[in-house]
């Protein structure tokens, strides 16, 4: 059970809201949330880092000097890893970093993460009608009224994202706006404050509640 304070547009407390989510057992919670987080971050990796071995570096086919008689250390190629400009030993090659995780586990991890952020979550009344046109300053001021600390990461969860709200928030560097049915574990965990509308909370209950 997640209990949250409901605030209006002016930042005044007008009630309470609750969210009932089935979460992981306490002894397993940290492990399953960690797995889901690592999976998401790994799946976002391009995996295209690449370095050339001594066989792939251009040149180096001719022996730089004869084997014996020069007094210098023997050398077979100017592209030896020991040489400047040579190949790389055990360097990275393009690879697939993606990890698999069962859908039930992913959803359990997300519900557990949401429930763990209850102390940092604020529910607000729907405010889309406050923006007849994009106003970045008004949205930034509203976030402060709702308890978000200046320059600290804020996750704003809406059931639908009105265009004027999106345009108002896209230039606020510390703000991330997501739909309630498109949450991810990284943004839920990394936000310092989570602000959700009452309708978004209902959507979360509908989509993720079990």
From Swiss-Prot:
Q: Does the keyword Ribosomal protein apply?
A: yes
Protein family membership: Belongs to the universal ribosomal protein uL4 family.
Compositional bias ranges of the Polar residues kind: 41-51
Taxonomically, the superkingdom here is Bacteria
**Biological process terms in GO annotation:** translation
Q: Which gene encodes it?
A: rplD
The subunit structure is: Part of the 50S ribosomal subunit.
Instruction: Please identify the protein, giving its name as recorded.
Output: Large ribosomal subunit protein uL4
């Amino acid at each position: 059970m997640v209990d949250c304070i409901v605030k209006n547009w002016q930042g005044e407390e007008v009630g309470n809201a609750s969210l009932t989510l089935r979460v992981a057992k306490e002894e397993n919670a940290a492990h399953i949330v960690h797995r889901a987080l690592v999976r998401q971050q790994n799946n976002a990796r391009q995996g295209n880092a690449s370095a050339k071995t001594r066989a792939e570096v251009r040149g180096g086919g001719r022996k730089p000097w004869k084997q014996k008689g020069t007094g210098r250390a023997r050398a077979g190629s100017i592209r030896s890893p020991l040489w400047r400009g040579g190949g790389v030993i055990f360097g990275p090659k393009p690879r697939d970093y993606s990890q698999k995780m069962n859908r039930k586990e992913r959803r359990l991890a997300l519900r557990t993460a949401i429930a763990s952020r209850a102390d940092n979550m604020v529910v607000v009344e729907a405010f889309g009608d406050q923006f007849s046109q994009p106003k970045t300053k008004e949205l930034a001021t509203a976030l402060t009224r709702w308890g978000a600390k200046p320059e600290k990461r804020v996750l704003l969860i809406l059931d639908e994202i009105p265009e004027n709200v999106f345009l108002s928030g896209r230039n606020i560097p510390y703000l991330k706006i997501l739909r309630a049915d498109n949450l991810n574990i990284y943004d839920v965990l990394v936000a310092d404050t989570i602000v959700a509308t009452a309708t978004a909370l209902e959507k979360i209950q509908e989509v993720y509640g079990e």
